[in-house]
């Protein structure tokens, strides 16, 4: 299973990263990571758009869900049944907003391996025939930070932009909504950025840079889709 995952995801991403590193002027692995991140975000845009619209729809109907919960507050079974019927009637999948996260998880795992290999220069055995081996990899991002090592600045940026993205979604909530989902979202708005920062602080800065760029891209997409919607 590990070999299969390596062949179908890790190896292609590694080759794409090294190809970008070779063709982008200056041979800066940071620029290659940014370019790779943008390509991945463009590829995931359809699922992100669908998820965001579904999440916005769920927020729009939150008052009706709160009303159903209040109506059946003494009968949890009837409450659950009424909510599921409401979802079916309005053609809502409450779990569809999790799709981008489920897609991103294997990509993140693969990228962790990609950056470990790419930033260490241990790549020769994994390169396709048409991707030249660049030899040593320049891991200094504009000469300011070594992306092969953890960097507290990138960790703080990763957590900070994660908070901004979460805050943008919370701002779409109906005023006064107090449903369970809304309470959990508020908790996650603070928990996830802290967790992201802690994890990023322990990983190579290249992975933190990926998370910073992908979150910035998501914020832009989110703003565009919400404005359009």
Give the role of each language-model region.
Residues 1-229:
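Helix-loop-helix
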